[in-house]
Design a protein with these regions (language model features):
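Intrinsically disordered, low-complexity glycine/charged-rich regulatory or linker segments
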Residues: 1-100
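Conserved class I S-adenosyl-L-methionine
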Residues: 126-133
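Conserved SAM-binding loop of SAM-dependent methyltransferases across substrates and taxa
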Residues: 136-148
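Class I S-adenosyl-L-methionine
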Residues: 1-37, 175, 182, 188-262
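Conserved SAM-binding motif I beta-strand of class I
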Residues: 149-154
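Conserved glycine-rich SAM-binding loop
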Residues: 108, 133-135
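Conserved SAM-binding loop
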Residues: 163-164
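Conserved alpha-helix/loop element of class I SAM-dependent methyltransferases that forms part
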Residues: 110-125
Length: 262
């Protein structure tokens, strides 16, 4: 099930409560102190984990919820799995694409771009795509195969130039513009007609897009953020009212946890 409205707010509140209640378990950074602060309270679990061999840890690295560990681990693992479960977005067929479209794009990156594009099912047919922090604009060019206009914003002038050449080679109506999206003049690049997209926009970059797109009156956008720790502030700055009301304050170290897991 795709969470929206009241269901999304309920899930957020449950997840927030879970993280606040058990922050003594997840906040301490591993490998920074000989004994973790929670070991005295959960002595049996701590002893069990310390008996595990490196080979066992490597074998179970990608399936931590399946560990046959003592309490309170099983209950916490089940609840964490429930709260992190997400519905599968519907997808669409992209149709036949020019072979040149994926030239010079690493295979893994092209898979991510294609998977992102397949799940963009906007209620309104986009008339003008805006590829935020676009690099060479591979995502934007894929989306613009329907004949829509395309604007790509990128900070690196070499990527801007390379992207413009690729778009011209495919005869697309695309403009590749050099832009620092964190600069004061970035908002002038967005208008209500744009359908902004951002794939792997790190930290402040995706937050900046959300703010500017909202201010510009963009009716729809799609963002796949990453690297939440790459922000200028010392703590995460929430945008939604429920998140701002939370007592949980996430530091840069807290925001690095997903990266540490991988």
């Amino acid at each position: 099930m795709i969470l929206t409205g009241h269901a999304l707010r309920e899930r957020f509140q449950a997840l927030d409560d879970f993280l606040v209640s058990h922050q003594s378990l997840w906040r301490p950074k591993p490998f920074t102190c000989p004994v973790l602060p929670w070991e005295a309270e959960h002595a049996e679990l701590a002893a069990w984990l310390r008996r595990r061999s490196l080979a066992q840890a490597d074998a179970e690295h990608n399936h931590p919820a399946e560990l046959p560990a003592p309490a309170p681990f099983p209950a916490l693992a089940r609840r964490a799995a429930e709260l992190s479960a997400l519905g599968q977005l519907p997808s669409r067929e992209l149709g036949p694409l020019p072979e040149r479209l994926s030239v010079d794009v690493p295979g893994r990156k092209w898979q991510q771009i294609s998977a992102f594009a397949e799940r963009l099912l906007f209620q309104r047919q986009p008339a003008h795509w805006l590829d935020w922090c676009s690099g060479k604009g591979h995502l934007g060019r894929l989306l613009a195969q329907g004949g829509q206009h395309l604007t790509c914003l990128e900070y690196d002038p070499q990527l801007v130039e390379a992207g413009q050449r690729l778009s011209e080679r495919l005869q697309l109506a695309a403009s590749h513009l050099q832009q620092d999206v964190l600069a004061d003049d970035a908002g002038a690049r967005l208008t209500a007609e744009h359908s902004p997209v951002a794939l792997h926009a790190c930290g402040d970059l995706h937050v900046r897009l959300l703010r500017l797109a909202s201010a510009a009156g963009c009716a729809q956008l799609a963002v796949a953020p990453c690297c939440y720790n790459r922000i200028a502030a010392e703590h995460y700055q929430a945008l939604s009212a429920p998140a701002r009301a939370s007592t949980l304050q996430l530091s840069l170290d807290d925001l690095r946890l997903p990266l540490a897991e991988t």
